[in-house]
Amino acid sequence: MADCITIAPELSFKDQITELAAHLSRSLPNADNQVAVKEFVQGYEAQVDTEEGRGDVEDAKKKQVVKSIVDKFVELKGGLEAAKESEVESSHFLLQHVLSTTFDQASEEYAQAVKDVNEAVKKGAQETTKITRAEAASRVLKNTYNFLPSNSPIRPSTLLSLMSLLASTLDLSALPLPTSTLLPALSSWSIPSSEKVSFLTTASGLYQSTGNLAKALELLTLALKESVEPTVVERAVLLALAVPNKFELDDVLAVQGVKEQLGKVQGVVELFEGDEVEAIEKGKKWTAENVSLIEGAGIPGFTSETVLRKLRLIALVALCTKSETRQLEYAPIAKALAIEESEVETWVIDAVRSKLIVARISQPQSLIRIHSISSITASSRRFGPSEWQLLEKRLEQWKKSVNEARQVVEEAETVAQQGLGQQRRGGKRREEKKEKEDKEEQE
């Protein structure tokens, strides 16, 4: 079977079917019964025998036999049992060759046959207790995807079968799906935009189920670029809120047409666009009124506290941005964030770990000293009249500091020059004194 890819075109149709039947026999419930296995294989041989062994099998008969083989693959859950690992892949390569040469590849019956086999392989992998069988199944689905033409409308469903298998049985992260690879694939698949959206939303759900919320959001954003559907918009906004270290909604809101389809999430979006400190109390009200929306999203780790955490951290960044002295005492932070003073340090540490600010905590003085502020929040990038005024004040302070530093340097240079002059004059007097003493000694 290892050489079936090379020799498949050279095999007769009967031999191809016999090879497939022999492979399937290993997955039979009574596979250890040699008589039953032999009868199983001979049954398929009999179906493709021509009169006196001469001539080709008629096309209609071929299709009937191949459909029977496909049904058996489905019944035996992909036929993943084999004498050696490579046999599973080789047999499925042969099966794909038989399907593509028996049916018109543009026909619905061909597409359905491939999908049925893919689903059977996935199901067999998910139900097996042997990791090697699951790994073999994943390779089969990868090979099937690569066997299909790049524009094949069956590729999306094949890829989803593979992703579903990996997500439930192995490791979805083992299948990198970078945008640079996905976008060309999407554009080449011969499917309508609605099916592309369906693929992307389903794939997003698989990543969400494994806890990779950032990737799930990335795929939903791509889906929105295909078609702005209210349900997808709502899902994308909630996912953006759920991603732990994402503090803005720009990627989603930047898609044309999204802002007009916000629906139920309009209120929470507005919290990220208004006054940062006021947003905390408004956020408490919104989360209390939308518990069913938050819980119904079914996003791992996404709760009302997830939303309030982000609002508080954004408010903290806003306070840091507006501080003229680049330092903040605990009391005003606690008041603005609606927390106890004893909790301030915890929130500052969270902001630092989230790379929103770089700051140092002074416990004796109960204040934080701000070294730098990130631009990854919408509030830190917002620049209005108050920000211009603050910038003007800071520029004046910096200008004053620079002038003072320059004055200190100039004074130091003057002192240094004066000291050098005095040293030179002192040296000359010492030389004159020495000459005088030498002269007196000679006399």
Swiss-Prot record:
Subcellular location: Cytoplasm
Domain PCI: 205-375
Family annotation (Pfam families): eIF3m_C_helix (PF18005), PCI (PF01399)
Domain of life from the UniProt record: Eukaryota
Skewed-composition ranges (Basic and acidic residues): 429-443
Annotated GO CC locations: eukaryotic 43S preinitiation complex; eukaryotic 48S preinitiation complex; eukaryotic translation initiation factor 3 complex; eukaryotic translation initiation factor 3 complex, eIF3m
Disordered: annotated segments: 413-443
Gene Ontology process terms (BP): cytoplasmic translational initiation; formation of cytoplasmic translation initiation complex
The entry's keywords: Cytoplasm, Initiation factor, Protein biosynthesis
PROSITE patterns per UniProt: PCI
GO MF annotation: an example: translation initiation factor activity
Protein role: Component of the eukaryotic translation initiation factor 3 (eIF-3) complex, which is involved in protein synthesis of a specialized repertoire of mRNAs and, together with other initiation factors, stimulates binding of mRNA and methionyl-tRNAi to the 40S ribosome. The eIF-3 complex specifically targets and initiates translation of a subset of mRNAs involved in cell proliferation.
Family to which the UniProt record says this protein belongs: Belongs to the eIF-3 subunit M family.
PANTHER family given in the database record: COP9 SIGNALOSOME COMPLEX SUBUNIT 7/DENDRITIC CELL PROTEIN GA17, EUKARYOTIC TRANSLATION INITIATION FACTOR 3 SUBUNIT M
Subunit and partners: Component of the eukaryotic translation initiation factor 3 (eIF-3) complex.
Protein name per Swiss-Prot or TrEMBL: Eukaryotic translation initiation factor 3 subunit M
